[in-house]
Amino acid sequence: MEREAQVKVNRRRFLASATAAAALGSTVKGAASNRTIYVVPNFHPASCGWLTTFSKERVFCANSYLNHLDRVRDDPSYAFVLSEVNNMIAIMNFRPERVPELKQRIQEGRVELVNAFFLESTINLSGGEALARLGAEGLRWQQKVFGVRPRFAWTIDVCGTHDQMAQITSGLGLEAMVYTRKNPTGKALHWALSPDGSRTLAISPGHYSELSPVFKTKEPLTPKELDEVAKFLDEKQKITPEGAPVLVLGGNDDYALAPAYQNYPREFIAKWKERDPATEIRFSTLSKYLDAVLPALKSGAVKIPTMPGGTAYDFDAFWIESPRMKSWFRRNEHALQSAEMLSTVASLKAGFDYPADALYRAWVQMFLSMDRNSLWGSAGGMVFEDAKSWDVRDRLTWIEKESNKTLAGAGSAVLASGDAIGVFNSANWKRSDPFVIQAQVAPEGSQSQTLADGSVLCEMELQPASVGAWKVVQPPKEASVPLPEVIETDHYWARVSPQTGALVSLKLKPGGREILAAPANVLVAEKPKSQSGDPGDFILGRPQRDKLASSLDYPAQISVTTGPLATTVIVEGKFLGGKTSRRLMRFYQHNPRIDFETEVEDLPNLTVLVAEFPLAASVDEVRRGIPFGFSHGAWAKPNPELHGWTTGIVPAVRWSHYALAGGGGVALFDRGLTGREINGNTPIIYLYNATDKYYGHPNSWLSGAGKHRFHYALMAHGGEWATARVPHAAWEYNCPPVILQGRVAAPPKSFLQTSPNVIVEALHRDGNEIELRLAECMGSRGDAEVVLDLPHKGAWLTDLTGGRRKPLTGGPRYHFPVNPQQIVTLRFGAGSAVSVPEPIRQWDELVPSGKLPALHEYSDQKGHPRDAA
């Protein structure tokens, strides 16, 4: 039935496009002064809370959209677009009697569900799988509940667009992505191109809330005001490709309502027709604009530029603040994906009841956690913690507990109860990186040592995507020793200053090449030379900040412990404002990674804290992790073939890498410290942006008060980028093996193997199928291999939603070509089915009982919460 419905929709779109093409053709051939202006009214909130709680925000959102729906009812010339599933749920919960009317207007084409994604997320801070699920589940929800399939990636409030968005958009079967900031092409329409060659139409006509005089006036516009509108439209014409109609995303600032003057837009359109008969203004949905322009784009009658890669970034504070939020989200992301994977194995191999409903609800709360202001950290404190309203902490806690519960349950099904220790490796490659066990025992056969806090540091070879259990042994305790003059490992010689505790030298083996130009892992507290706008939104780059203090300014007390696996250096001392700091550095004997754990306390308001790593050689190229891949750009050495953005403060997912002149490079890994910047040859990782209040609202998740702990790491290497396997090492740092206590000893079994050029981000069940998603991770064209040792029959290459299938032969070993950074989704017939969760329609079952009254509280408030009494 869904496929038949899709065919009918496509036919209607074809007829609409054909009619629009004919109209557009006559416009192109006619007088140059003839033009059509499409105004697309929209409402832009922060739907999970910005300056008020989640519970109150959804009231404003529901009523504001209903305000637009009222104007559709009252004015036949009005239309608008509606975005975000949680806003639709709010309408369904508070005003269910309006839902049939909404569905009717959607069928009439006067309201459009414009956004395929579940909500308008920040696209730059999550992993790839979370972004893919956000789109796939958003599509599924809207198809199931409203019977329509949105056509767009509606990302109007993202503050920079990464290189993989074209591929994600096309992979979801969408026709265009819409963004409004940092358009580098100068044209409202252009092609966006991803590294794998995927292309999608990019629509970027300006701000998301323009033509404000029409929306904010409470009486008809005067002739002088209409003159200003004419000037505005003329400016829009300049960025519109020749032959294309003009697009305006209409509204009056954030939280825009329908025009305040009740007789607009009807009277405005009529008046404009008298004033300028050659310009037709239509208040429209976005699909009607696309139907008008798409045929001419496809035929080449309208020519547009191409944007390879991504854009620049702004609202730079978003990338460097609230590490508590970003780190917790990152942990949950990896834990949930691991829980799905182990549940899939346990259900197909050991009769485990696959928890489809619980996993779906965990993903839904991940989506809400991806709401822009939540994951940015830029909101009032009530969004993150509130005594009465469902908040970010509630959702993150729910995901964490459910993921751990699922891992334990699936582990118990795969490994029987006993006195051994189980280890689950979700990574699709053989690994031997160090990890910590929160117990006083280690698996037999591993290298291990007991740390000072009683936990155990462990290193052992783990098979790809495997689970096994080992008898336990008591590891030796590490011993206290004086600070060595040189810390020697298999990979480097390192020196730590006995005065400051800085890492002052790092020489690679075998040749002794010095990596550092000056002391590294130095903490620097800084303050902007000036401040424009709220510091939770805007922060100046490092050249425009003054230094307040450095860890080099304070004497250090240093203690050292060592064991068979690692040497740990702990540096304690004073820091800014007479407060304390603690820096832990762990040097592994057999692994090139150096781990850092840094603690500070009570950072003064408006303080930026960074850790700097001055490099001895010139940095030629910069790579940084983005969803499903990496951005790759030139630095000191110009290269027009590299399109990645490298200037200023930029977001990174898990890692950044700096390729050095003469070969080799340095990678910085993080567990939710997403901000990076490089000036000259000195990369920095942002640790904190202390902001006590956000737009006047206290927020303990932004404030510098209290203690703060940061986890990050460095890995230096000689040789080529490809041999360093930086994306793999970053994944290992973020996704350590899962420990399953109290199991029966059993040899490890691998259920998935792949070629080394891909990283698997997801393995889960969907109805009667298994879905596996991976991405080429080295940036090179080649061949990929997948070997799936789970019961299955039949395999297909699909898009991100399971559609557009191409059969694969040769199971259980499958081969297929991959382009650079290509996202690949495979589906396998499972032989049995699990339940397909019903789309969520209310939040009650997820909300703590004490917070249900606030969730259900309704009022007539609409517009901007800032303006509420």
Model-derived segments and spans:
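N-terminal secretory signal peptides and thylakoid transit peptides that target proteins
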Residues: 2-21
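Acidic, His- and aromatic-enriched active-site or binding-groove loops in soluble protein domains
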Residues: 100-113, 170-185, 195-198
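CE4/NodB-like, metal-dependent polysaccharide N-deacetylase domain
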Residues: 131-164, 168-171, 230-250
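Catalytic grooves of carbohydrate-active enzymes
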Residues: 39, 44, 48-50, 200, ...
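Alpha-helical scaffolding within the catalytic cores
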Residues: 67, 94-103, 184-195, 223-236
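N-terminal catalytic cores of secreted or lumenal carbohydrate-active enzymes
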Residues: 32-133, 141-144
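C-terminal segment of N-terminal export signals and the immediately downstream linker at the start
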Residues: 4, 26-36
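C-terminal (or distal) subdomains of carbohydrate-active enzymes
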Residues: 165-170, 204, 216-225, 231-233, ...
